[in-house]
């Protein structure tokens, strides 16, 4: 994947302002609420019976932070995202058996969360750069499946 200097700047510039715990928790919670079939991968998280339960679940918040912290590795390593996520791809494919489509869904939700948090600072150019990034990350995570 080739990144323009502008794309890199838009991604890293916004990333520097992201509250990883808040945005990560919100993104994972939204995934579980909007696409409830994804909850089956999180049975050990306890009560996910309603949007209120999901949003208030500390395990959802903690794992969301973990997911977005990991996503930060992509931001730091834009030129080697496949290598950055090779072990996570293996884990999600071989051990957890996660449908790779879920990576795309979570990426799209992350873009929604960033747009909600950053409003007018999340310009169309910024959105395009982030949409490209979440696609590249989703593809890297799904790599072990191919």
Curated annotation (Swiss-Prot):
Tissue: Red blood cells.
Any one Gene Ontology molecular-function term assigned to this protein's record: peroxidase activity
Recorded GO CC terms: blood microparticle; haptoglobin-hemoglobin complex; hemoglobin complex
Globin domain ranges (all copies): 2-146
CDD domains associated with the record: Hb-beta-like
Swiss-Prot/TrEMBL keywords: Heme, Iron, Metal-binding, Oxygen transport, Transport
InterPro entries, per the entry: Globin, Globin-like_sf, Globin/Proto, Hemoglobin_b, Hemoglobin_oxygen_transport
Family in the record: Belongs to the globin family.
Subunit structure of this chain's protein: Heterotetramer of two alpha chains and two beta chains.
Protein name, entry field: Hemoglobin subunit beta
Upper lineage: Eukaryota, Metazoa, Chordata, Craniata, Vertebrata
């Amino acid at each position: 994947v080739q990144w323009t200097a502008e794309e890199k700047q838009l991604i890293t510039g916004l990333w520097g302002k992201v509250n990883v715990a808040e945005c990560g928790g919100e993104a994972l919670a939204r995934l579980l609420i909007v696409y409830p079939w994804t909850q089956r991968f999180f049975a050990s998280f306890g009560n996910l019976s309603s949007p209120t339960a999901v949003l208030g679940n500390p395990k959802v918040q903690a794992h969301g932070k973990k997911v977005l912290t990991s996503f930060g590795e992509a931001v730091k390593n834009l030129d080697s995202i496949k290598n950055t996520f090779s072990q996570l791809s293996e884990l999600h494919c071989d051990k957890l058996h996660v449908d790779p489509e879920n990576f795309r869904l979570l990426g799209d939700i992350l873009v929604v969360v960033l747009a909600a948090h950053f409003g007018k600072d999340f310009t169309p150019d910024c959105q395009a750069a982030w949409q490209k990034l979440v696609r590249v990350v989703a593809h890297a995570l799904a790599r072990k499946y191919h």
